[in-house]
Regions:
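Non-catalytic accessory segments of DNA primases and related replication-initiation nucleases
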Residues: 1-112, 116-121, 125-130, 142, ...
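Short, acidic loop-beta-alpha module within alpha/beta folds
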Residues: 3-4, 15-19, 71-78, 150-156, ...
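Acidic, divalent-metal-binding catalytic cores of TOPRIM
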Residues: 132, 136, 217
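Short loop/turn motifs at secondary-structure junctions and domain boundaries
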Residues: 135-140, 197
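A short, hydrophobic, proline-anchored segment that marks a local hinge/packing element in signaling
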Residues: 142-148
Length: 237
């Protein structure tokens, strides 16, 4: 059935699967002891999360196109031994140099969702010529790794410098969608291989996961610059 399918193939718990299916058909699962106000807030939160997902997916597609348009970034990935096919499988992209590149992707660069999603940084204490707070892209001149939840939705990014620079890896900040200490990079693609193999390899970085997958080790995941937490372990059970 549909619930069993989501539990097996999306790694959801029974309750998560029920809520997900209900949301897809416009129903709301009653919460024990939840007031109407709490239910309304929960509905608004789900809507906000869906909107943020849309913003991040749009950015992911733009970064993928920018990778194809950047010989330097393509050469870097080839130098790391990665094929075009594996880059496509993982949705790798490139964030070009420039402080406001995403303004070409999102015409309304002042949209608050760009900050809430972690794509753009805003400095309230610095004002531009228009009197508004200064904004600029968080990720610049980096290989981009979309981070997806167990449903395959983009919830954030990891960006790696091409040359020397610090930090080598830059993650999305904490957002309504993304919590670094809870997520595992690559789990969305690795979940079936983990189940079939009966084991999982936990590595340090995004690039390790992609490289291992290219060489047939498809049951690898990476923590996002943190040690393995109880939340990570729970996702793998």
């Amino acid at each position: 059935n549909a619930i069993g399918f989501l539990m097996e193939h999306a790694g959801m718990s029974f309750i998560e699967a029920v809520k997900d299916l209900a949301q897809q058909i416009g129903l709301q699962v009653p919460e024990d002891d939840a007031s109407p106000q709490d239910r309304e807030r929960a509905a608004q939160q789900r809507q906000k999360q869906a909107t943020l997902n849309d913003v991040l997916e749009k950015a992911a597609k733009a970064y993928q196109k920018d990778l194809k348009d950047s010989p330097r970034a393509v050469t870097y990935l080839k130098g790391r031994g990665l094929s075009g096919q594996i880059a496509k499988t993982f949705g790798l992209g490139y964030a070009p140099e420039g402080w406001r590149h995403l303004a070409g992707v999102f015409p309304d660069y002042s949209e608050p969702l760009l900050v809430e999603s972690g794509l753009v940084i805003e400095h309230e204490d610095e004002k531009g010529q228009d009197g508004e707070a200064k904004r600029y892209d968080r990720f610049r001149d980096r290989i981009m790794f979309p981070i997806r939840n167990v449903k395959g939705e983009c919830i954030g990014f990891g960006g790696r410098v091409l040359d020397k620079g610090e930090p080598k890896y830059l993650n999305s900040p904490e957002t309504p969608l993304f919590s670094k200490g809870r997520e595992l990079y690559g789990l969305w693609l690795a979940r079936n291989a983990i189940r079939d193999a009966g084991r999982v390899v936990v590595v340090e970085g995004y690039m390790d996961v992609v490289a291992l997958a290219q060489h047939g080790v498809e049951y690898a995941v990476a923590t996002l610059g943190t040690s393995t937490t109880n939340a990570h372990a729970q996702k793998l059970l």
